[in-house]
Amino acid sequence: MADPHEIVNVCGIAGLDYMMKAAENTVLDVKYELPSCVPATPFEHSGAVIDAEAMKEPITREGIAGLGEFMNFPGVINAADSDLDKIIVAKQEGKFIDGHGPGITGKELNAYAAARIAADHECSTVEEMSDRPEIGRAHV
């Protein structure tokens, strides 16, 4: 599973296109996560801005397995329309959503999970790691 977050932050969807085209010349069966947060936070400057509208075409492509790690967890927890719209686009296509919720537990974690975030690889404490399976979320 490839998450082309960095190249898409710099080059936009053209970076995703490049990665997918380059992988066609390998023996690997590469699946991709469409980056969910471009830029990663509203405080960053990047070479592209990918909003829900811009996600509608690439999320339907063969080889796009889901939405890449949703790093703007405060936006999800606080129900920011721009973030929820991205989640809706992915779910309408039957795609999974990868998580990125460092430090969130309890009610905040429940809110994050309610948005149907499927997994989280950011656990750094025993509490965080034990909370996720209890609410049906994988720690990967």
Residue ranges of model-derived segments:
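Active-site core of metal-dependent hydrolases
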Residues: 69-139
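Divalent-metal coordination cores built from histidine and acidic residues
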Residues: 1-94
